[in-house]
C-alpha cells in the first residue's frame, strides 16, 4: 500500500517584511473586532425594533469581515499562516440608535488613524508592499467615513425624537 505524502508546504516569500506581517496580523484583528462590534450593534438594534438599521449594521459587519480576509489571503499567498487572535466580548446593550451612529463614526475615525500611521511608517521604511496594502485600506476608509458621516449628518437633520429615528431606521433599511 502506498503511503500518502504530505502536500507541498508553501515557502515563506522573502518579499514580505516582518513589519508587514505584524501589521497585517494587527489589521486582521482590528477588522475582526470591527465586524464583531457592528454585529453586536446589529443584534441590539434588531431587538429594539430598528430592523432597517439592524440590516444595515449587519451588512457593515460582513463588510469588515471581508476586509480581514484581504489580509488573511495576502499572508497566505506569501506563505505566512495568519494568526487568529482572541477578541474581547462586545457590549450587548446600547443607549439608542443615536449612540450607535456616533460610536460607529468615532470607530471609523480611529481605524483610519491606525491605517494612516502604518502607511506613514511603511513609507519611511521604504516598505512598498506594505504601503500599497495600506493604500487599499485607506481607499476603503474613505467610503466607511462617508457612510458614517452621512448618518451623523442625517441624525442632526432629522432629530433624535421617535419620529426622526423611525424615519432614519426606514431609510437605513432601504424602505
What does each model-identified segment do?
Residues 1-175:
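Iron-associated oxidoreductase/ferritin-like identity signal
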Amino acid at each position: 500500500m502506498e503511503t500518502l505524502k504530505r502536500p507541498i508546504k508553501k515557502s515563506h516569500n522573502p518579499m514580505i517584511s516582518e513589519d508587514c506581517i505584524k501589521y497585517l496580523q494587527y489589521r486582521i484583528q482590528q477588522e475582526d473586532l470591527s465586524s464583531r462590534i457592528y454585529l453586536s450593534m446589529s443584534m441590539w438594534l434588531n431587538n429594539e425594533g430598528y430592523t432597517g438599521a439592524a440590516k444595515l449594521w449587519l451588512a457593515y459587519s460582513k463588510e469588515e469581515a471581508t476586509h480581514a480576509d484581504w489580509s488573511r489571503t495576502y499572508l497566505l499567498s506569501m506563505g505566512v499562516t495568519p494568526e487568529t487572535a482572541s477578541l474581547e466580548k462586545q457590549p450587548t446593550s446600547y443607549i439608542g440608535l443615536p449612540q450607535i451612529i456616533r460610536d460607529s463614526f468615532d470607530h471609523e475615525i480611529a481605524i483610519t488613524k491606525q491605517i494612516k500611521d502604518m502607511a506613514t511608517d511603511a513609507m519611511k521604511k521604504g516598505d512598498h508592499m506594505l504601503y500599497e496594502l495600506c493604500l487599499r485600506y485607506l481607499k476603503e476608509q474613505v467610503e466607511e467615513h462617508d457612510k458614517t458621516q452621512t448618518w451623523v449628518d442625517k441624525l442632526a437633520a432629522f432629530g433624535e425624537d421617535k419620529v426622526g429615528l423611525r424615519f432614519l431606521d426606514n431609510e437605513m433599511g432601504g424602505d
